């Protein structure tokens, strides 16, 4: 299942709902428009990268600005809009929390970068390998993990990455990156109290 993200900014991109499914190379990107919907896809593989829904407010009420909180009902409405405009393809979404409490089980130095560490982080349902550059990260900590598909307050989408040759699946967050009030200026991840439960959603 693709990581679905939906964006809406009435002032920035007019009355358009942006539905992203996956990245494709810019050179191969092309469009197929039917009615108020444009399908964005790869001209070589025919893989769908997303949909742009124009005149969105005539179909659905959107109260979010920026990244839209997805619910089952909202995704059903998106699929209804696609069908109404002649597209048979359906969007499927993962509704599990994207920001969760993690436990740093192990930390080892990155073999190719002095300031990076390779962390083994348990998040309840799975164990992730995350490359982290924070100076204060250490084994035994409870931290906030942004999973693949999470959208940071800055608008940055968390994607699978490779840092200096080492795969990284997610990000260990600082208070500043989460835009928490009174976040410290100095660099460093947010270390949580031990009372937080591993795997639980982190709300902010």
Language-model regions, residue ranges each:
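Phosphate-backbone binding interfaces of nucleic-acid-interacting proteins
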Residues: 1-204
């Amino acid at each position: 299942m693709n990581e679905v993200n939906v964006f809406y900014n009435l002032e920035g991109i007019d009355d358009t709902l942006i539905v992203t499914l996956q990245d494709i190379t810019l050179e191969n990107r092309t469009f197929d428009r039917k009615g108020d919907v444009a399908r964005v896809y790869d001209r070589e593989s025919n893989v769908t990268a997303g949909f742009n829904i124009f005149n969105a407010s005539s179909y659905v009420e959107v109260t979010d600005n920026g990244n839209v909180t997805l619910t089952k009902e909202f995704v059903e409405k998106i699929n209804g809009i696609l069908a109404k405009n002649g597209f048979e393809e359906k969007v499927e979404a993962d509704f599990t929390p994207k920001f969760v409490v993690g436990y740093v089980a192990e930390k080892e130095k990155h073999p190719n970068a002095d300031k990076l560490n390779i962390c083994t982080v348990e998040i309840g349902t799975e164990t992730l390998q995350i490359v982290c550059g924070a100076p204060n990260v250490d084994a035994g900590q409870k931290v906030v993990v942004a999973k693949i598909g999470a959208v940071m307050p800055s608008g940055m989408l968390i994607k699978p990455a490779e840092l200096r040759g080492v795969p990284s699946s997610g990000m260990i967050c600082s208070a500043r990156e989460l835009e928490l009030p009174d976040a410290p200026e100095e660099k460093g991840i947010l270390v949580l109290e031990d009372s937080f439960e591993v795997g639980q959603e982190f709300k902010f």
